Amino acid sequence: MAHKKAGGSSRNGRDSQAKRLGTKVYGGELIPAGSIIIRQRGTRFHAGENVGMGKDHTLFAKVDGYVKFVVKGALKRKTVIVEQYTGEAA
């Protein structure tokens, strides 16, 4: 009986696509309203002044301005704010 029995297939062999999360704009950069600042899972960063949060926790600019990262409150939350651009250089 020189036959080889069929081997079982591997249970691995697949992977999910990368989700391209992370910071898209850094502190001090000038961005237009509607631009994505951070794509994240959960609230690693919180929305501050002039920043909105999408249903997938993406942070985006509500106004044209300069991005600023700050730590706020007793809980030391990492917060993103956008200081409105008025036309003069920062």
UniProtKB/Swiss-Prot annotation:
Keywords: Ribonucleoprotein, Ribosomal protein. GO terms for cellular component: cytosolic large ribosomal subunit. It holds the Pfam family Ribosomal_L27. GO terms for biological process: translation. InterPro entries: Ribosomal_bL27, Ribosomal_bL27_CS. GO terms for molecular function: structural constituent of ribosome. Residues 1-21 are annotated as: Disordered. It comes from the Bacteria. Belongs to the bacterial ribosomal protein bL27 family. This is Large ribosomal subunit protein bL27.
